Amino acid sequence: MATADVRQELFGHADQTNFLNCSKGIKSWMFTLDHKRIGIMYLIGVTFALFLAGFFALWLRTHLWYHGTAIEGEMAAGSDAFFRVTDIAYNKLFTLHGAIMVFSFIIPSVPAALGNIVLPMMLGAKDVAFPRLNLASFYLWIFGTGFLMFALVNGSLDTGWTFYTPYSIQSSTGVIYATFGAFILGFSSIFTGINFLVTINTMRAKGQTWFRMPLFLWSLYATSIIQILATPVLGITLLLLICERVMHIGIFDPVYGGDPVLFQHFFWFYSHPAVYIMILPGMGVISELIAIYSQKKIFGYSFIAFSSVAIALLGFLVWGHHMFTSGQSPLVNVVFSAITFTVAIPSAVKVFNWLATMYKGSIVFTTPMCYAMAFIFLFGIGGLTGLFLAALSTDIHFHDTYFVVAHFHYVMVGGTLTALLGGVFHWWPNFRSSTQRYDGPHRMLVRLRRFQHHIFPSVRDGCSRHAASLRFVRS
């Protein structure tokens, strides 16, 4: 008997054809409609965006060492002079880091990469509902990210990733290219949301009711609702910004009777729900990992499922907490603050149910499980720091400080990136017919320690500026 036949007899999968080797050549990948291949291409693309934005983050940090000692764009004398950036260069690196990390990495990372790969298989479907639309969304992601990159070489971008007016109207940098890139990325996000929503609604296997779906699919469903309803608001806002720069239509520019605060309302009406586009899919991944590696049925399945939908719906009602210092009426601020605290309830439901699932479970400390536990730890810190920003009395002091930077990074990077890595370590061996690395938990602990060393000092730095005003004086 031939060697291949022996392997087939013993293992049953030797030399079998899979989605990676079924066809060869770059064209087979460029024009593929296979959801798994599209997910792999998304994973490669967002990884590139992660490393590029991460490089900008490291580079802008050197500004704290060599404050304003080098001429922008030139090499000064000395081996380390290249890393010395001016204040202007700092603004550009800060903006590019935020824009690429948010629009090109965090938003599409878990839903578009992991979601594309596992969603049809979890449903028992052959593919997503609209395979061609799925491929189109990936190419829109490439074009949108390309426009952001083009802004890098065409005057760069120094407005901050939020594109706040009126400065974004007046800046001589590549604002139009960057906003158009974000506009295209919005279409990519909408197409993904439509595809997933229709797929989950219409292509579930026979007998798979709503409350038999994996919790990861519930999180993708809630995320898709946000993508479809909120992203068009951002797209229209960015188009208005471009028209304001080109035609001076007087929407956001106060010189022509516009209102810059209106831009903030439009932007955050999308961007706060977008926070849940970033974190909800990661929560779904963690729900799967906790149940599998605790070797228990998930505790409170229905509560976790409905909490995803509740977070998605409440996320549309809290955008104003980003604008407590913008001149809103005190009554509006109180309302937004109260609703913001309400959002913490379904988030806490998820965390406590994860802990209850782990309680008395036969926990297997594999790499994915370690990432899931790290997620709970980091997301817990991010959630606790968020309470200070939801309260009016403390947000006034913490606004625009490193405290906000720490909160955002604990939730987005400590949450989304950790969940993405946990999901990749969990599902990738199944696709490659390989085993998990035994040194994975050690590597995770190294990453966790480095992340803490990098981000936690920002909490202290954000508090120090107003420490005197926060002290309790004993009478």
Region locations from a protein language model:
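Membrane-embedded and interfacial regions of multi-pass energy-transducing membrane proteins
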Residues: 2-475
